[in-house]
């Protein structure tokens, strides 16, 4: 089983790009492999709690995201997938909650029983661009997005990428077609090596 996660600050295009890559994988690989596209947070009950808490309690948020992940992965693994495409995963919890002052090692310990992604696509863009995109979205929940918050989260993501060679950075300031082309090249190359 391979896990490919899509990460980045809110507004970076994770949902759009992960869906397009999933569809390209279905066409390229065909139905002979079980490929699942999913996103976090998953449970509607936990999403409601997360929206209620907002940024006020980062410890509770980290615990809720981790509980959601445990529940979510349990359901996914029962389906015996060969490839899982994740719109957010462990690095999101690390980037967001550690930017709020929670110790990264504590977050990692909470998540140590979950499989690490085999490949992570980090869609990177400036917080100002992200804010402009978020303002145009009406279908996703988000907290009170601020440039200062997104800047801290972006810095944490870039720090994680420097420490982990499984994370590939894609410039999300480009057009969707360019982002898809670069991302597809990375994913396709990765899967061809296994």
Curated annotation (Swiss-Prot):
Protein residues bound to ATP: 8-15
Family matches, as Gene3D superfamilies: P-loop containing nucleotide triphosphate hydrolases
Catalytic activity, reaction form: dTMP + ATP = dTDP + ADP
Organism domain of life: Archaea
Keyword match Glycoprotein: no
Keyword Methyltransferase: no
GO biological process: dTDP biosynthetic process; dTTP biosynthetic process; dUDP biosynthetic process
Keywords from the named record: ATP-binding, Kinase, Nucleotide biosynthesis, Nucleotide-binding, Transferase
E.C. numbers: 2.7.4.9
PROSITE patterns named among the record's database cross-references: THYMIDYLATE_KINASE (PS01331)
Single GO cellular component term: cytoplasm
Single GO MF descriptor: ATP binding
Family per similarity comment: Belongs to the thymidylate kinase family.
The protein's name: Probable thymidylate kinase
Organism ancestry: Archaea, Thermoproteota, Thermoprotei, Sulfolobales, Sulfolobaceae
């Amino acid at each position: 089983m391979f896990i490919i996660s899509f990460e980045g600050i809110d507004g970076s295009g994770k949902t759009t790009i992960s869906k397009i890559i999933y569809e390209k994988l279905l066409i390229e690989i065909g139905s002979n492999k079980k490929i699942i596209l999913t996103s976090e947070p998953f449970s509607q009950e936990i999403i409601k709690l997360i929206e209620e808490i907002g940024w006020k309690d980062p410890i509770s948020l980290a615990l809720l995201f981790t509980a959601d992940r445990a529940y979510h992965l349990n359901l996914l693994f029962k389906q015996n997938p060969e490839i899982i495409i994740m719109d957010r995963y462990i690095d999101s919890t690390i980037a967001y909650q550690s930017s709020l002052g929670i110790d990264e090692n504590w977050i990692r310990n909470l998540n140590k029983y979950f499989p690490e992604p085999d490949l992570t696509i980090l869609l990177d863009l400036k917080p100002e661009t992200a804010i402009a995109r978020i303002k145009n979205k009406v279908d996703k929940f988000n907290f009170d997005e601020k440039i200062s918050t997104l800047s801290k989260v972006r810095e944490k993501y870039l720090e994680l990428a420097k420490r982990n060679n499984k994370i590939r950075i894609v410039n999300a300031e480009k057009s969707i077609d360019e982002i898809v082309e670069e991302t597809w090249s990375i994913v396709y190359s990765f899967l061809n090596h296994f």
